[in-house]
């Protein structure tokens, strides 16, 4: 007998995954009071990052959780799988994507996140928390200059967060795609985001009227930036 697989869902933002985005994620779970987990790995498990998460969740009918990576077996009784796979949604924090990826892979979190995605647990985040789901993208995770980073590869192609907020993002992203050094992909302004079902764009959203998303590709040797007009959430 054939078993129907759950729809895989990812909700990203270019920067700023606040109450409106969390509310939308909660709706995507289909649960009346969803369990939402925050992974502040990219922000080095800073207390301030977790505090902001709880503040953003406070107006919503959700059960908010945080899972740090800097833990010890003497203080954490539950395994990573018991925590992550018991959730309805998982949000990755902003911060250092390169370090985030290294820690997740060392701890086997990358494998569990794919299992969560396959089970229909909604994944998401902004900045490092949006970049992490793609094949690759632009990052400020290294000293001196913007560079590139390889990520989980759940969504094929590349990603640039903070497209309107950091002056170097747009020219570097277009240069890398134009030269063929980076795959075509999606760029998001701060306060704008994309909801993917499976790996296809289902809805483009924003919490600020001027914020937009883009699909950037190379056509006949030239870079083409196509605007994806969002709707307010």
What do these predicted regions represent?
Residues 92-170:
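Class I SAM-dependent methyltransferase SAM-binding "motif I" and its flanking Rossmann-like core
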Residues 51, 78, 110-111, 171:
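Residue-level marker for well-ordered alpha-helical positions
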Residues 1-33, 43-60, 137-139, 143-233:
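C-terminal and late-domain segments of enzyme folds
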Residues 12, 65-68, 91-92, 123-126, ...:
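General beta-strand structural signal in soluble alpha/beta enzymes
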Residues 37-38, 43-99, 103:
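Portal/gating segments that form or line small-molecule/metal binding sites
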């Amino acid at each position: 007998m054939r078993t129907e697989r759950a729809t895989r869902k990812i909700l990203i933002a270019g920067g700023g995954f606040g109450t409106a985005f969390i509310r939308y994620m909660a709706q995507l779970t289909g649960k009346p009071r969803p369990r939402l987990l925050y992974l502040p790995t990219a922000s080095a498990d800073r207390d301030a990052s977790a505090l902001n998460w709880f503040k953003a969740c406070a107006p919503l009918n959700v059960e908010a959780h945080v899972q740090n990576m800097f833990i010890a077996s003497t203080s954490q009784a539950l395994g990573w799988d018991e925590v992550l796979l018991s959730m309805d949604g998982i949000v990755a924090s902003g911060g250092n994507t390169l370090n985030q990826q290294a820690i997740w892979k060392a701890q086997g979190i990358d494998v569990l996140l794919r299992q969560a995605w396959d089970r229909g647990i909604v994944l998401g985040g902004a900045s490092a928390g949006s970049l992490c789901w793609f094949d690759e993208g632009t990052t400020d995770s290294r000293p001196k200059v913007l560079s590139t980073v390889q990520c989980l590869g759940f969504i094929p192609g590349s990603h640039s967060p903070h497209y309107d907020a950091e002056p170097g993002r747009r020219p570097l992203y277009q240069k890398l795609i134009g030269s063929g050094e980076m795959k075509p992909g999606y760029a998001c302004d701060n306060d704008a985001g994309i909801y993917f079902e499976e790996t296809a764009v289902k809805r483009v959203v924003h919490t600020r009227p001027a914020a937009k998303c883009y699909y950037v590709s190379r056509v006949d040797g030239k870079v083409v930036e196509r605007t994806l007009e969002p709707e307010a959430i």
